[in-house]
């Protein structure tokens, strides 16, 4: 028997890393936190505006690495055609940003970072989320940010993180 008691936010070593969890109680056992994959839609403090889009939670992480640049304009023929079609104006979102791309000579995948020995905020986010409850329950875990990096570098895990979708929550496969 369990019931949701509301959202709980965990914040760890990287100041901009926090994620939502939901507290569950299965009496008479201790509280258990499960991570909430519904994104901001279950956050009662969040004002959802579909025209503005979701918060770009990873954008600061992406830009701070210094290996991407924003395109000066929409570069695809199809994208320019859609942009110039006035009959679509009533459908446009307010939040469309120009896309990013890797700077010349840069590899910007999580695997490339992992192989260079770099632990990204995305990797730390995954480790934190995968370890919910472990510390409180006295469970020693091996899912550290370094473990996540090693698994990605070895090709045993992937962390899809498109730079042009900074609203996407990091996850690991």
Q: Model-found features: residue ranges?
A:
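Metallocofactor- and cofactor-centric catalytic cores in central/energy metabolism, strongly enriched
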Residues: 13-24, 28-173
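Single conserved hydrophobic/aromatic residue that forms the stacking wall/gate
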Residues: 1-5, 9
């Amino acid at each position: 028997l369990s019931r949701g008691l509301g959202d709980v936010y965990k914040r760890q070593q990287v100041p901009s890393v926090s994620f939502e969890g939901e507290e569950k109680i299965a009496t008479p056992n201790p509280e258990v936190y499960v991570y909430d994959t519904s994104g901001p839609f279950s956050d009662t403090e969040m004002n959802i505006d579909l025209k503005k889009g979701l918060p770009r939670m990873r954008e600061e992480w992406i830009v701070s690495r210094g290996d991407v640049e924003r395109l000066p304009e929409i570069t695809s023929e199809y994208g320019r055609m859609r942009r110039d079609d006035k009959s679509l104006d009533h459908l446009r979102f307010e939040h469309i940003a120009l896309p990013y791309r890797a700077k010349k000579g840069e590899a910007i995948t999580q695997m490339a970072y992992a192989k260079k020995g770099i632990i990204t905020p995305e990797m730390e986010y995954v480790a934190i989320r995968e370890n919910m409850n472990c510390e409180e329950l006295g469970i020693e875990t091996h899912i550290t940010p370094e473990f996540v990096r090693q698994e990605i570098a070895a090709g045993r895990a992937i962390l899809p993180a498109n730079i042009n979708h900074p609203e996407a929550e990091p996850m690991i496969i």
